[in-house]
Amino acid sequence: MTAALAVVTTSGLEDGVPRSRGEGTGEVVLERGPGAAYHMFVVMEDLVEKLKLLRYEEEFLRKSNLKAPSRHYFALPTNPGEQFYMFCTLAAWLINKAGRPFEQPQEYDDPNATISNILSELRSFGRTADFPPSKLKSGYGEHVCYVLDCFAEEALKYIGFTWKRPIYPVEELEEESVAEDDAELTLNKVDEEFVEEETDNEENFIDLNVLKAQTYHLDMNETAKQEDILESTTDAAEWSLEVERVLPQLKVTIRTDNKDWRIHVDQMHQHRSGIESALKETKGFLDKLHNEITRTLEKISSREKYINNQLENLVQEYRAAQAQLSEAKERYQQGNGGVTERTRLLSEVMEELEKVKQEMEEKGSSMTDGAPLVKIKQSLTKLKQETVEMDIRIGIVEHTLLQSKLKEKSNMTRNMHATVIPEPATGFY
């Protein structure tokens, strides 16, 4: 991993990097640099750029209905549960993007099993995972950024993405202004004209026989004309005008290139001479400062030894006092635990007492209240009235029953006397 993790080795040096020995073991631990804590921010920014190249906004965020994370989302702790879910889903998408089948994790899945599956896929790509799986359970940190960055690189390799060379901007220099547009020749035009002249010369060299015949005829004509007097037919004013017209076109401007190695070599020589001259002056001061620092460190070490020897008894007393303090703290913790238990029992007893008091108050209020007594009196009065009415009804019923019995008895006697006919009465008729 590119992040500055603590690596255990068996030697004091590996790849020219100094290492310090761990206390109590024979192993050697790689020292973390001062910028190791900020390396995960760089990895996270690279991860965001790689995800943009993989079009994760269209293919992952919109389909999963998720919010786009910030540039340092997995580097800083915000919401561990949300970050862990985002890490698992993004890792699964990157694994599928890299050509490996991987099921999308759900919220109810076991996090340990999910992390184990992700790490196994990471090792199958040939990447190292020399850290405990619990580092990924938080959902943020350098290990989370490392795992996602590895999956993003594998996905880019699978889709055949290649990084192109950077295109540096061309620095444009100010050119001299000329009245006419085409009054200036550049170095490219000069090269083109030079190439055209070379091609013309080659064509002339090919037709050597024709050239010899032409030169022979010209020599014959010149020998015939040498007998005449040579006179110039050129006008001086026209010649000067032609020179003034052609002169701007003959000007050649060569652009200076800032990337020319000659300029850099000169600058390097200048810087080297400046460094050597400055080193001669500062070397003496640096040597003097080094000697003073060495003497000061020796004095500090000797003073530390003297102070340790002088304060050894006080240090022992301090350690004994620390031990007594720890024992007192333990006893205090034990006593505090008993007090807490008794306080809990007291609170329970107080609750029961409050309940009893409340019940007593309710009963006392019910006893002192006259409303129930009034109700009882009213009920008794009503019962008495009902009893009188019932007695009257009973008397009426008894009287009616007695009358019915007397009437029945009289009817019976009447019937008995009506059925017996006296015999002497019949003889007189």
Curated annotation (Swiss-Prot):
According to UniProt, the tissues expressing it are described as: Present in many tissues such as brain, thymus, lymph node, lung, liver, skin and kidney (at protein level).
* InterPro entries in the record: Intra-flagellar_transport_57
GO CC annotation: axoneme; centrosome; ciliary basal body; ciliary base; ciliary tip; cilium; dendrite terminus; Golgi apparatus
UniProt record, GO biological process? apoptotic process; cilium assembly; heart looping; intraciliary anterograde transport; intraciliary transport; keratinocyte proliferation; motile cilium assembly; negative regulation of keratinocyte proliferation
Q: Where is this region: pDED?
A: 335-426
List keywords of the entry alphabetically.
Answer: Apoptosis, Cell projection, Ciliopathy, Cilium, Coiled coil, Cytoplasm, Cytoskeleton, DNA-binding, Transcription, Transcription regulation
Stated role:
Required for the formation of cilia. Plays an indirect role in sonic hedgehog signaling, cilia being required for all activity of the hedgehog pathway. Has pro-apoptotic function via its interaction with HIP1, leading to recruit caspase-8 (CASP8) and trigger apoptosis. Has the ability to bind DNA sequence motif 5'-AAAGACATG-3' present in the promoter of caspase genes such as CASP1, CASP8 and CASP10, suggesting that it may act as a transcription regulator; however the relevance of such function remains unclear.
Assembly and binders: Component of the IFT complex B, at least composed of IFT20, IFT22, IFT25, IFT27, IFT46, IFT52, TRAF3IP1/IFT54, IFT57, IFT74, IFT80, IFT81, and IFT88. Interacts with IFT20. Interacts with IFT88. Interacts with IFT80, IFT-81, IFT74, IFT172, IFT70B and KIF17. Interacts with BLOC1S2. Interacts with RYBP. Interacts with HOMER1; the interaction possibly prevents the pro-apoptotic effects of IFT57. Interacts with HIP1. In normal conditions, it poorly interacts with HIP1, HIP1 being strongly associated with HTT.
| Domain commentary | The pseudo DED region (pDED) mediates the interaction with HIP1.
Q: What is this protein called?
A: Intraflagellar transport protein 57 homolog
Q: Which organism is it from?
A: Homo sapiens
Q: Which gene encodes it?
A: IFT57
